[in-house]
Amino acid sequence: QTGGGCRASNYIHLLRKALVKAGYPQIPVASLNFSGLEKDSGFQMTLPLARRALACIFYGDMLCALRNQVAPYENEKGAADRMVDLWVERLGRVLLAGKGFTAREMKHTFPLIAKDFAAIPVTRVPKVKVGVVGEIYVKYSPLGNNDLQKFLESQDCEVNFPGLMGFVQYCIFNMGEDHVLYGGKLAVKMGTDQLLNWLDSVERAMLKATADAGFYAPGPFKELVEKPRGIISLGAKMGEGWLLTAEMIEL
């Protein structure tokens, strides 16, 4: 639950209503939020869990980006998907062992992932490249977007989905931007700036590893945030607001 004026704040109530209607009122729906909503949901985000979650988002973004740049051109059908499965299993073991989520460990792992995908035999031929931008649920959920990625790939297109980490940084940035626009506690602005600097360091390492392996790598978030200036206010944040404009310009 984002706590904003978007649908994400209300999904949980719709899910509970649907479960009751389907005859499963005993099934709980836990909320992940940083807005003080659903305090008794039974799910609490701790710092160690947050660090692992951020690492998973970085790894997931990289795997998706590399998979989508290899799959349309692979000589052996399914090779890219098998590589994704291999790394998901490998990273899962590492994270469960309490490793792999520090900045140093991620920066060490990124080039290894990129190298493995670059080793997949491909035949590069011209294809239509389609970028997908949208509200967070519709962009990533096959159910929400009518399985858009599968359809585009069936039309022999290369699909580009901007990563989830961009949305995470967007949410953090907005907390600091609210201080600039409306005032509030300076500590919030300072805290968000420090967190964004840490995320930027890891993100740039991921993008460098991607580019060094011969793949397309978008600009980091700190460059992305500059793109919509003069087109839309950075205070426009409902429905992913200025982020959608920035991603369209980037693509």
Indicate residue ranges for each PLM-predicted region.
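An N-terminal assembly and electron-transfer interface module characteristic of large anaerobic redox
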Residues: 1-251
